[in-house]
């Protein structure tokens, strides 16, 4: 409930900020503050503070010059504190993220009288992995290197980076660096950084011997101690797809602010899309038998590991993938693009029966392999309890976990390829890319994510604000509602820009002899 006390706090803070900065109040900014505050103030909760009412979302189109950051911060921060909720400000671009963290929030905290803490949340890949650094410094040919299997994760052991890794260790020891890639004194090349970072799949978490000193987990602890977290749409979507609360606070205890909110549907589509490169997949499948033989030799207690069963699964999958190439290759004739990347789109997103049947077989065969890898991953996690083998197992578990995740990703693609779309729902886009050489990449993607966003985000969050300069067509938000799944019963408003462009500028559209959609002709 928006009490008189909260209203007064917001008004006083806003007035103090304007006075301190020498700003003049803008009608559109004041309207935005009121809309956000009223939307959040209408949220009903039970005795545990859990939202019980519907329509907790406020969607505001506000043009350049409105002062959107000040508007939503002035309204949300006092209300969130009063309700005991966290605030997550999410942007689509690094530029706006840095503007908010390094300029806007410090200004607001200093001049408004609102006392709050904030931090910047980043993904795991932005932080150094101590386990991997330790491995690299001890032995350049550690399992994590020699057994990499993703194409974009393959790299050669390069002793020229050893000096960099030793300098990293020295700076960490002196407290001159916090393990954040962005805070290193120079730009770090990707092929130097990748070997000393990890992802959520290959991270062993609390079981890692370096857990207490892990820079990612230290940063995550900070996330749960502050009032306001600034991050990006991708990290929010990743957190939601992991169930919520994996990196960021639980959605039920969070008021989300999506700045540059027009990007949100496309970001969500990217997270729900699947793809698979045939030759690349064959490459990592071929490595599995050798990896497992090496694992079995290193750990005597893995004697019960059924290597033959893994070998059979790999052989079957390799054969099926060759069938994929034979079956899909004739489509190259109808593909569009350049010589190095041709694309064939399946009409209406629908595959022919033969393509779907093969995808169904591959889904089943990949599922068999994934099940075997999942059992092995669980086995290794159990063995981690044995301190005598902990160091070696910490090197092997990420490798097996990564293979398991890769198999799951392949299953997702084959599942999308084998299914027929429900005629009452938007179809999925499905296409194949013919790349240089004989590489063939299959893709499947939703064209609409409104139901997924409703399920993962809008139905769970305590409250949300979505804002951007481009959300509506005139005063009509219906297209944005369809794309995001935000129910029309929520609050929507398109604010007038404080800039009178119509009185100060003229838009001239030149006569052109070519269609702007034809890029080559248009550029000539």
Model-derived features: positions:
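Hydrophobic "anchor" residues on beta-strands that sit immediately upstream
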Residues: 57, 86, 228, 255-256, ...
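Signature of the SF2 helicase/ATPase Hel1-core->accessory helical subdomain module
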Residues: 78, 95-98, 103-106, 200-228, ...
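A substrate-engagement module of RecA-like helicase motors
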Residues: 2-15, 24-27, 48-54, 64, ...
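Walker A/P-loop
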Residues: 45-75
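Conserved beta-strand -> loop -> alpha-helix junction used to position metal-binding or nucleic-acid-contacting
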Residues: 86-95, 113-130, 252-263, 276-288, ...
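A contiguous, basic/glycine-rich beta-loop/short-helix subdomain that forms a polymer-engagement track
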Residues: 194-229, 238-247, 376-513, 517-524
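Walker A/P-loop NTP-binding motif
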Residues: 37-41, 69-83, 103-107
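N-terminal pre-P-loop "Q-motif" helix
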Residues: 23-48
């Amino acid at each position: 409930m928006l009490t008189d006390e909260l209203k007064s706090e917001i008004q006083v803070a806003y007035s103090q900020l304007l006075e301190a900065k020498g700003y003049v109040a803008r009608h559109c900014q004041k309207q935005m503050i009121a809309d956000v505050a009223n939307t959040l103030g209408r949220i009903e909760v039970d005795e545990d503070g859990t939202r019980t009412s519907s329509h907790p979302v406020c969607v505001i189109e506000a043009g350049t010059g409105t002062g959107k950051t000040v508007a939503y911060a002035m309204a949300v921060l006092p209300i969130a504190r009063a309700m005991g909720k966290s605030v997550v400000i999410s942007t689509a671009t690094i530029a706006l993220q840095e503007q908010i963290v390094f300029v806007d929030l410090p200004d607001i905290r200093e001049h408004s009288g609102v006392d709050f803490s904030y931090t910047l949340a980043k993904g795991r890949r932005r932080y150094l992995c101590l386990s991997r650094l330790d491995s690299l410094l001890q032995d350049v040919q550690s399992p994590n290197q020699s057994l990499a299997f993703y194409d974009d994760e393959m790299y050669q052991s390069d002793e020229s980076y050893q000096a960099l890794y030793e300098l990293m260790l020295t700076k960490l020891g002196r407290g001159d660096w916090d393990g954040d890639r962005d805070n290193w004194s120079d730009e770090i090349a990707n092929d130097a950084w990748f070997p000393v970072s990890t992802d959520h799949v290959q991270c062993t978490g609390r079981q890692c011997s370096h857990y207490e000193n892990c820079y990612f987990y230290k940063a995550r602890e900070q996330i749960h101690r502050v009032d306001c977290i600034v991050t990006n749409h991708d990290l929010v979507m990743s957190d939601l797809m992991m169930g919520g609360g994996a990196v960021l606070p639980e959605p039920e205890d969070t008021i989300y602010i999506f700045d540059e909110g027009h990007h949100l549907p496309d970001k969500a589509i990217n997270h729900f899309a699947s793809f698979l490169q045939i030759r690349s997949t064959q490459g990592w499948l071929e490595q599995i038998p050798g990896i497992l033989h090496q694992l079995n030799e290193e750990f005597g207690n893995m004697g019960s590991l059924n290597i033959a069963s893994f070998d059979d699964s790999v052989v079957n999958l390799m054969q099926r993938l060759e069938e994929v190439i034979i079956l899909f290759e004739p489509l190259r004739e109808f593909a569009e693009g350049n010589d190095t990347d041709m694309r064939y789109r399946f009409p209406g997103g629908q595959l022919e029966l033969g393509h779907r049947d093969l995808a169904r077989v591959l889904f089943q065969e990949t599922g068999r392999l994934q099940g075997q890898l999942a059992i092995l991953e669980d086995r290794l996690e159990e063995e981690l309890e044995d301190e005598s083998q902990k160091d070696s197992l910490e090197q092997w578990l990420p490798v097996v976990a990564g293979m398991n995740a890769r198999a799951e990703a392949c299953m997702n693609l084959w599942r999308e390829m084998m299914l027929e779309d429900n005629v009452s729902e938007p179809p999925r886009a499905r296409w194949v890319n013919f790349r240089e050489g004989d590489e063939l990449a299959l893709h499947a993607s939703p064209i609409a994510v409104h139901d997924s966003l409703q399920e993962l985000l809008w139905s769970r969050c305590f409250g949300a604000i979505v804002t951007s300069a481009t959300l509506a067509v005139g005063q009509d938000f219906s297209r944005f509602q369809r794309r995001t799944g935000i129910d029309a019963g929520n609050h929507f408003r398109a604010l007038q820009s404080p800039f009178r462009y119509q009185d100060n500028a003229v838009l001239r559209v030149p006569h052109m002899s070519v269609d702007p959609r034809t890029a080559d002709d248009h550029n000539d």
